[in-house]
């Protein structure tokens, strides 16, 4: 219930602060008016009968203004500091009470199931935040791997395949999904989808474990692909597309594949809808979920998306001649400026994919069951992001961030802060601000390898998102110093050597490779959270590892502690 009231609480905060600002502006105007009138009166009195009486009147007015300003300062403090803290404390208290009630001895004695979909009290206030200051970020190290039971099932035959994990975590619970193919990993005709939800609990050793409370296996003949998942109040929401042909054929077509939203609640209610967002048909040749997780934001569920835009459509024309070159390129690329600009502009268009413009964006859906025409597509401006690719959305406090897979020519981790504009209660536009970094590279072939630093056309890379440990907005220049953690494939051209790391804008601070040299791997997802009891920060690194026994890949969750050295 608390999670469901989050949008209302956020709206009340905005209304309260807006009213406060209007009140303060009125007070300021009145104060200026009173001061102006008092000066005129003072002049008149001094010219007529001296200044004794006017000084008394002016002193009275000054005292009145001081009282007004004192009240105004108290209002500012209450609205900006005290009220948000009280709301956070109240939320934590309510969640703790609900957790305690649903696991009480009385319920257990009455044979009631005591498992609530709420994380342990130690973690509720330690989720979706920045965990270290800028100074602390310079001295972080990775702890050893912690042994926990895996909440991710693997293939059970040598021919089976589990791929494309997506994981989402909020204060209350987590949601997870991956694709299951019965024979090999290359299949655009038939697959199933595994979904689970659960909570974080402490082990007797003191570190966290992930307890699964509900699972769902979608095996109904619908070939859902590239699914992106998000936690929502009381359950999970998932965005998938239905694949019926190879990826290249999707881009060459003129109508996008079927788009689906699935809502799964903890009480076993399942709602699935085929969605038709306005502005997609006849504009997008194909539209795919970003595979990385989405977020629940102000009553809307936001998912990363990307696809191919048809030539001469309104979106195509609006993005014409737009390009983005990351800040770090200037000092690292030997091309002259004109060549960089020309190559950067052409990098958004793929001849392999029928000369479509490869575009990134956000799918925004209200949290309701009738979603057929309610979801919206919000494209990023291509002078703020690179060529369209898989991605992930994050919540850090009240801020939304975006990871974009480095499919294009710049091989480094691409993170952005996202601003969402609302019009008449609906998200209407998005903008992105890049966190400048020259770490951490992904592998690629030819001119698109991990060593490339100059603009050009690339369609390479691998999904490897990262978690920000420090706030990029904490520096005078946005993102000039930021620390983040994740996993990457430590090779220039091959998908090998999975390595967990902590890095900043310019260097890798700490790293640990998993397995022997040459170990094959693929996608990597990273999420961090804090145990507010011990104040320790943990990160879960979900990595696709190649397997010679069961399936081509096994999806494995690794947990490490991030510590100050």
From Swiss-Prot:
<keyword id="KW-1133">Transmembrane helix</keyword>
<dbReference type="InterPro" id="IPR036278">
    <property type="entry name" value="Sialidase_sf"/>
</dbReference>
<dbReference type="GO" id="GO:0055036">
    <property type="term" value="C:virion membrane"/>
</dbReference>
<feature type="region of interest" description="Involved in neuraminidase activity">
    <location>
        <begin position="223"/>
        <end position="228"/>
    </location>
</feature>
<feature type="disulfide bond">
    <location>
        <begin position="528"/>
        <end position="539"/>
    </location>
</feature>
<keyword id="KW-0348">Hemagglutinin</keyword>
<keyword id="KW-1160">Virus entry into host cell</keyword>
<feature type="disulfide bond">
    <location>
        <begin position="448"/>
        <end position="458"/>
    </location>
</feature>
<feature type="disulfide bond">
    <location>
        <begin position="227"/>
        <end position="240"/>
    </location>
</feature>
<keyword id="KW-0378">Hydrolase</keyword>
<dbReference type="GO" id="GO:0016020">
    <property type="term" value="C:membrane"/>
</dbReference>
<dbReference type="GO" id="GO:0004308">
    <property type="term" value="F:exo-alpha-sialidase activity"/>
</dbReference>
<feature type="glycosylation site" description="N-linked (GlcNAc...) asparagine; by host">
    <location>
        <position position="139"/>
    </location>
</feature>
<keyword id="KW-0946">Virion</keyword>
<feature type="disulfide bond">
    <location>
        <begin position="333"/>
        <end position="454"/>
    </location>
</feature>
<feature type="glycosylation site" description="N-linked (GlcNAc...) asparagine; by host">
    <location>
        <position position="504"/>
    </location>
</feature>
<feature type="topological domain" description="Virion surface">
    <location>
        <begin position="42"/>
        <end position="565"/>
    </location>
</feature>
<keyword id="KW-0261">Viral envelope protein</keyword>
<keyword id="KW-1015">Disulfide bond</keyword>
<feature type="glycosylation site" description="N-linked (GlcNAc...) asparagine; by host">
    <location>
        <position position="110"/>
    </location>
</feature>
<keyword id="KW-0945">Host-virus interaction</keyword>
<dbReference type="GO" id="GO:0020002">
    <property type="term" value="C:host cell plasma membrane"/>
</dbReference>
<comment type="function">
    <text>Neuraminidase activity ensures the efficient spread of the virus by dissociating the mature virions from the neuraminic acid containing glycoproteins.</text>
</comment>
<keyword id="KW-0812">Transmembrane</keyword>
<keyword id="KW-0735">Signal-anchor</keyword>
<feature type="transmembrane region" description="Helical">
    <location>
        <begin position="21"/>
        <end position="41"/>
    </location>
</feature>
<comment type="function">
    <text>Attaches the virus to sialic acid-containing cell receptors and thereby initiating infection. Binding of HN protein to the receptor induces a conformational change that allows the F protein to trigger virion/cell membranes fusion.</text>
</comment>
<feature type="disulfide bond">
    <location>
        <begin position="175"/>
        <end position="236"/>
    </location>
</feature>
<dbReference type="InterPro" id="IPR016285">
    <property type="entry name" value="Hemagglutn-neuramid"/>
</dbReference>
<keyword id="KW-0325">Glycoprotein</keyword>
<feature type="glycosylation site" description="N-linked (GlcNAc...) asparagine; by host">
    <location>
        <position position="267"/>
    </location>
</feature>
<dbReference type="InterPro" id="IPR000665">
    <property type="entry name" value="Hemagglutn/HN"/>
</dbReference>
<keyword id="KW-1032">Host cell membrane</keyword>
<comment type="similarity">
    <text>Belongs to the paramyxoviruses hemagglutinin-neuraminidase family.</text>
</comment>
<keyword id="KW-0472">Membrane</keyword>
<dbReference type="GO" id="GO:0046789">
    <property type="term" value="F:host cell surface receptor binding"/>
</dbReference>
<dbReference type="Pfam" id="PF00423">
    <property type="entry name" value="HN"/>
</dbReference>
<keyword id="KW-1043">Host membrane</keyword>
<dbReference type="GO" id="GO:0046718">
    <property type="term" value="P:symbiont entry into host cell"/>
</dbReference>
<dbReference type="GO" id="GO:0019062">
    <property type="term" value="P:virion attachment to host cell"/>
</dbReference>
<comment type="subunit">
    <text>Homotetramer; composed of disulfide-linked homodimers. Interacts with F protein trimer.</text>
</comment>
<protein>
    <recommendedName>
        <fullName>Hemagglutinin-neuraminidase</fullName>
        <ecNumber>3.2.1.18</ecNumber>
    </recommendedName>
</protein>
